[in-house]
Every structure is written in structure tokens, then in C-alpha cells.
């Protein structure tokens, strides 16, 4: 018999034993899958409140608590035993004696398995070695676990299993649980900051008749009643700009976005973004907002603006470095795209510097490829790269001094993009021309180029005030602030291949 077959047979034996115990509970009139249970404390509340009291003080005060959670360890024999109960906040030891809980409840304790959910009422005390514990006066089985937890010492070694069975990961891996609690706090802090600065949170459609707001392949679905194709949104942008037209001057939305693209440590087809728009602002205002927002979140959630990511120490305290994309390319490669160059010259530069390009690319595309291939991953400390070429920025306002470029920036930290923002294009005639240029790109083979959105152009024709806009990938921000190497580590249920 192979080791795998042996393990499978052993698991089947354990499953049967647990089901037998479940049936025995039912035979004894006990529901193995209980209903409501009222507790007075979480484990860490007990520890925080009473850890500093001496053994004698605890005996004198006779403090009673009721706690509930999952049994993670168990030891002892005869008429007494110890176990560790785990809840949301951590673990606490319980001590169960037959003469304290009675014969029936002690039998339930003795037959309980690791992973079972239990409720305990008892007195807080300290053991002889000083561990704060709860001496049970009542022991109740709340839910019988019919499957054993992963082995205590080996845990979930298979990373893919951690992602597929996140519920097990959360049970046995405190760091994973901490990551997702921190994620929630990050989003809460983000909301509070924006609410306090006068932004209005809104909700806009997830299914669009025309995909827009980003260069990406959409997921396509079909509305049966209307008999029309619909697209899962690839960005939140265009509906929020319509709201700016309508007079909602400072808006934001936190929501899911869907892009039918590859999966990597940085990409998941379904991810969370925040997009915000502010009337009468420009990209420089949004730069200031971005660095202050991120620094505020770090300070509020982590208590510091200096964080560790991998081997790098990152300083999030404003102000952050600002550099034009053309200057960044010139510093790194010596190629000066401030000079007027032809497509042929740009292609020669790319060949000389081993920058991979496609035949359909213009000078602006090639400048961007220089940046992405030669510079992006070197930007470790927070850096705003601004002045993107107009060809890759169809929704951004042209720079008035050099219309080859736009008033746009991207934020890079630890070599990856974390935010994208610009002074929004509010000229409907220019916007139509940009969409038409994008259509030509699609015809030339760029299937991520924008489609024409007549409704959006019509909205601009009613007049959109000068506006600054921002998009931040929340998953990547959480990765940064929790020192997570993969986006899957910060998504509760990342997209996986079918087994």
C-alpha cells in the first residue's frame, strides 16, 4: 500500500469515528449541530482584563466568563483534562474536571475531537506555571466537526490548498486571519478618510453595455430578457464621471472590477478598486491626496508610515518622489524622447536597448515600453511617474505645454503599480477623436483598445468641470501593507484552475 493510499484509508477511518460520535450524541438527546450560544467574552478580552492579576487575586475575585470557539488542542486523562479554545481573537486554555461539570458533560468533553466547536462557562484562574485559563463549570458541544483539521505540525503546506480551502487556512494559520482582518481595517480607514474630506460614496453598475475606462479584455455575458450582450466592468471610471457632470462634485466607489486576463502573483481576474473623482481639481491635487491617503491608512492601521516589504523598508511619509516618464527613461537609458523622433527612430532606440515592441506601436507606445521594461521594477520607494504619452491615455487631458503627453501619473512602490490618476479629459470633441484613434488601434490588432462610447461623449457635451480622478488597486495596497508576496494571499477566495 502506498503512503497516499494509507493516508486516505486513515482519513476514512477518522471520518467514520466522528460520524459514530455524532450519532451517539443524537442517541443521548444532544443536537451535534447546536443553535444560539451567548458568550460574555472573547479569549483576548479575558487575557487582557485578567492577565496581570495574581493567582490569589483571581481566586478571591472568582470571575466567571462564558467563551466559545474551536477546540485546537486537548490533553489529559482520567477525571480532568486541558484544551485550548480558539476564537476570532486568539486562544485560551480551558481546564475541565469531572467533579466540576458533572458526569454527562465530562463524557462529552472526553469524546470531543480537535476541530469541534464548544462553549464553556467557568472561573478565570492561573495554572501552576502561570497560564491564564478558564476552569469549566459548564461544557457544551456546539458543533461536531466531521472532518479532522490539518495536522498540527505540518499544517497546510500545499499553498494551493490554502487558497482553495481558505476556511482551513483561517483556522490553522493566525497570520492569514490577521491579514484579512487588516484588509478590512484598511478599507474602513480609506472610507473614513474620504468621508471626512467631503467625498460621497456611490454605487454604479457592474454590467456595462460597452466596456470602458481601461485597456483590458472584458468578460462577456448575455441578458436574456433584453437579448443583448453585457460586459462585466473593467473599470468604474465612466459612470463616476457622468456623476461629476450631474453635479456630484466629489465621489468615490469601492467595488469589484473584472478583467479577462492572466493570473499571476500580481493579477487576479476579479479584483477590488477604489476610484474617486473631484471637480475643479487636477492631477497635482490628486497626487497630494494619494500620498496623504496612503500615509494616513498606514498610520491608522499599522501605527507607522515605515513598513517592511520583503527585504525592503518602505517610507510612506509624504512627500513622495515625482519624475516625468521621459526624464525617467532618459536617466535610465540615455534615450531622450523630449526630442521629436519618428516612429522609425523610436524603433531603432528600442532595438539598441533590447526593448520588445509590436509593429503597431507608435512613439508614445514605445516610450511606455521603455519605462515598463527598463525602469518600473527599479522603483522601490513611493514614486509618482507622470506625463504619460497621449496614445496610452485616451481619457486623460493633454498637457498644455506639450500635447504629446498627458497630465497623468501612476504610483509605483516596490516595483509595481499601485495607482493611476489624471486630470480628466473634459473636451467632448477631443474625447471623440481619442475614441476614434482607439478604434483604429483595434483594427490594427490591439484587442484591449477602447470602443466608442457615444453615451459618455454625449454626457461630456453637457459640460464636465475640470476634474481630477484616481484609481487605486486595493488588493495591491493590502499586499504592500501586510507584506504579502502574492495577490492570492490577500484575496479570501482567489480564482483557481478547476481540479
Curated annotation (Swiss-Prot):
Keywords: Aminoacyl-tRNA synthetase, ATP-binding, Cytoplasm, Ligase, Magnesium, Metal-binding, Nucleotide-binding, Protein biosynthesis. HAMAP family: Lys_tRNA_synth_class2. PROSITE patterns: AA_TRNA_LIGASE_II (PS50862). Homodimer. Belongs to the class-II aminoacyl-tRNA synthetase family. It is an enzyme of class 6 (ligase). This is Lysine--tRNA ligase. It comes from Bacillus subtilis (strain 168). GO terms for cellular component: cytoplasm; cytosol. Mg(2+) 2 binds at residue 417. GO terms for molecular function: ATP binding; catalytic activity, acting on a protein; lysine-tRNA ligase activity; magnesium ion binding; transferase activity; tRNA binding. Mg(2+) 1 binds at residues 410, 417. It catalyses: tRNA(Lys) + L-lysine + ATP = L-lysyl-tRNA(Lys) + AMP + diphosphate. It is found in: Cytoplasm. GO terms for biological process: lysyl-tRNA aminoacylation. Binds 3 Mg(2+) ions per subunit. InterPro entries: Aa-tRNA-synt_II, aa-tRNA-synth_II, aa-tRNA-synth_II/BPL/LPL, Lys-tRNA-ligase_II, Lys-tRNA-ligase_II_bac/euk, Lys-tRNA-ligase_II_N, Lys-tRNA-synth_II_C, NA-bd_OB-fold. Its EC number is 6.1.1.6. SUPFAM superfamilies: Class II aaRS and biotin synthetases (SSF55681), Nucleic acid-binding proteins (SSF50249). Its cofactor is Mg(2+). Its main location: cytoplasm.
